[in-house]
């Protein structure tokens, strides 16, 4: 059997999550959630399906212990509903900790994607930080920073770079001879992003659990970070925990991507654009209305149902009713798309108003003046 190849820069269009988790030693999260399963619909609906050492975070939440969260961003395009998933998770964690760290990977963007620092900063400010605040993140509980400007992380990356070598980096990431050295070093900066909450400003140990919520494509960073944490004995690091969520399917099937506007609903899309995208979306309906009513739809293959599942319907009973009506053929694709369109438009209209209020706060956060 051919093994799955994962890198943070090339996500497969289709992922067999079960096989991939088994291959890389990621455990099913349902085994450790306990009562926490009812605290977020991502847990209840198996949208978050895997973990490494998440029991540490469950223990911290249950017993009111200190822990930190790290969730980086590499702005390469407009923010869409797939990105919103991360904010929904951070909103969950901010109920239990005020130590939420959001690195902006401008160094990685420069080295790996040839993006200028100015472009990355502008995208981060206008598309991401502003939306993060508008979506409900508490500015008092987040530490947002540019990698290129945060000396603590850069210093730590230089120190930790001694704890790995070219052979390991090549094996994990598949780097080639023509890969620039900055790109090779970028994962070490990510390691420092993840581990720095366990140190004070003088890089002295302040060990605490850290959780990193990611897609499975980011697991190479997690594995490297955990290995380096165990090697750097002088810092007394607790290896970071991680959770793994499913990717949202693109509107036309396959991957959702900022570089392919037709595959995603952006948080700044207007009403006309949303309507066109949703009514063109791939569904789990049959080829004809007659067949759909006779055999029923397949919501598991429907991108519109996925919007309900991930974002638009938080009430489990209401979602179950839509599922059953689709399966029975009672609910047609046209009616379902109309419902999704109306809910998305209502959501984006409200978000637009909140975004106007969030812009000034976002600027202050990025300038370190909030």
Curated annotation (Swiss-Prot):
InterPro entries: aa-tRNA-synth_Ic, Rossmann-like_a/b/a_fold, Trp-tRNA-ligase, Tryptophan-tRNA-ligase_arc. Its EC number is 6.1.1.2. GO terms for biological process: tryptophanyl-tRNA aminoacylation. A motif ('KMSKS' region) lies at residues 255-259. It is found in: Cytoplasm. It comes from the Archaea. Keywords: Aminoacyl-tRNA synthetase, ATP-binding, Cytoplasm, Ligase, Nucleotide-binding, Protein biosynthesis. The keyword ATP-binding applies. It is an enzyme of class 6 (ligase). One of its GO terms (cellular component) is cytoplasm. It catalyses: tRNA(Trp) + L-tryptophan + ATP = L-tryptophyl-tRNA(Trp) + AMP + diphosphate + H(+). A motif ('HIGH' region) lies at residues 75-83. CDD domains: TrpRS_core. The keyword Metal-binding does not apply. One of its GO terms (molecular function) is tryptophan-tRNA ligase activity. Belongs to the class-I aminoacyl-tRNA synthetase family. This is Tryptophan--tRNA ligase. The gene is trpS.
